[in-house]
Amino acid sequence: MSNYDVIIIGAGPGGIFAAYELAEKAPELKVAVFEAGNPLEKRKCPIDGKKIKSCVNCKTCAIMSGFGGAGAFSDGKYNITNNFGGTLYEYIGKETAIDLMNYVDEINVKFGGEGTKMYSTSGTHIKKLCMQNKLNLLDASVRHLGTDINYVVLENLYAKLKDTVEFRFNCHVDDVEAVDGGYRVITKDGVDECKKCIVSVGRSGSKWMENVCKDLKIPTKSNRVDL
C-alpha cells in the first residue's frame, strides 16, 4: 500500500489540469494519477477498415480511455463560455468560471497551441441572421487546436508532469472508501490511501462515479447533454 497526498482518478482533461495545477502550486505534495487506459502513445484502436472492420470490445477502449481522455483524438476545440458545456458557474460564479477557462487556454497555448486561432460567434453575420429568424445562437469563444496540435499539447503536458506526478496506466479503480483522515482507493493491484481524492472519470465513468457518490453520501444531480 502507498500513501499519497492526492490521488486523481482519470487522466482526461480534468485530471491532467488538476495534476498540472498541483505540480505548479504545491510541488511538495505526493500526487498520483490512476488511469484505466493506456499512455497516449499506446492508445491504438484495432479497427483498420480491412482485417478488422468493427469494434472487438477491447478490455479498455483506446478511443474513450487513456491519457487525454475521450477527446485526445478530436479536433481539439476548447469552448470558453457559460452558455453550454456544463454548469461550473453555479458553484464558483460566472466571472471566475470564465477566468479559469481562459487560464486553461493559456496553458494549451503555452504547451504547443501557439498560432492556433480563437473563434467567436459574438457579433457575427450568423448571429444577426439567427436573431432575424427568432433563433438564439449561444455565444462562445472557441480555441481550435486541430487534431495534430491537440495531440502535441497532450504530449508536452505529459512530458512536463511525468517526473513530478506518478502515473499508473491500465489501473482500473474499483472503489473509493472514506477512512479517517482521507480516502482508500481500491484497484485490482491493491489498496492505496490519500488525504484528498479527485475523481475525474468523464462520461464513460459517470455511472461508476454515481455509485461511488451514493456510497459516500455525496449528493448528485443530472446534467444536460449538449448536442
Language-model features: where?
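Residues forming the flavin
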Residues: S2-G85, S122-L227
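Dinucleotide-binding Rossmann-like beta1-alpha1 core, especially the glycine-rich loop
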Residues: G66-T116
